[in-house]
Regions:
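N-terminal assembly/transducer modules of large multi-domain enzymes
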Residues: 140-175
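Conserved beta-strand-loop-beta-strand hairpin that lines the nucleotide-binding pocket
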Residues: 26-149
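Amphipathic alpha-helical surface "interface" segments used
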Residues: 16-19, 100-102, 161-163
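Conserved short strand/loop->alpha-helix "switch" segment adjacent to the catalytic nucleotide/phosphoryl-transfer site
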Residues: 1-19
Length: 175
């Protein structure tokens, strides 16, 4: 078995964000299942993962909130990574914290829904349009696995993500 050589601070932040992305499938897509694909490049220390579903998509999900009933698909993509943007079923923190992880340790962060893909690098947002329609949502993230980050910044200091990770994944004698 090959183990991924990954900086603990990246794991601590990634575990929180990965859970949030998976929870988005169950909470917001109107589907019970999604798909996860991962790839690790040990030579370049890059972990890639994709989470996809064939649910209602980001625009339809956000439009369940009265505040976003007239939102367009590109607008939905651009605001879904902002803090507290939600369809009313969540806190609006999962994709926001994932965007912070991408800023701290990421190479690529993309969200696809409907006919649009949004690529986020640093503070630049780029849209690709005229794509074939994707029923649902795809979240794709590439991370540096050898870069030390501050996991608390990824969650905007709202939760003790380090303690959560350690309690969930480490034995007491490993601390």
């Amino acid at each position: 078995t090959q183990y991924i050589d990954i900086e603990t601070t990246v794991l601590q932040a990634m575990s929180y964000c990965f859970y949030e992305i998976l929870d988005n499938v169950l909470t917001h897509s109107s589907k019970e299942l999604g798909t996860i694909i991962t790839h690790y490049d040990p030579q370049n220390h890059i972990l890639s993962f994709l989470v996809g579903d064939d649910g209602i998509g980001i625009q339809a999900s956000l439009s369940e909130n009265k505040q976003y009933t007239t939102i367009t698909e590109p607008e939905a993509l651009s605001i879904c990574i902002k803090d507290t943007v939600t369809d009313g079923k969540g806190m609006g923190f999962g994709l926001y914290s994932t965007s912070l992880l991408a800023r701290n340790a990421g190479l690529r962060f993309e969200i696809r829904s409907g006919k649009y893909t949004m690529k986020v690098q640093n503070d630049n947002i780029e849209f690709t349009t005229k794509l074939d329609y994707w029923q649902g949502t795809i979240v794709y993230l590439q991370l540096h696995t050898n870069k030390e980050i501050n996991p608390s910044e990824v969650v905007a200091n709202r939760t003790n993500v380090i303690a959560q990770y350690n309690e969930t994944f480490l034995n007491d004698n490993e601390l």
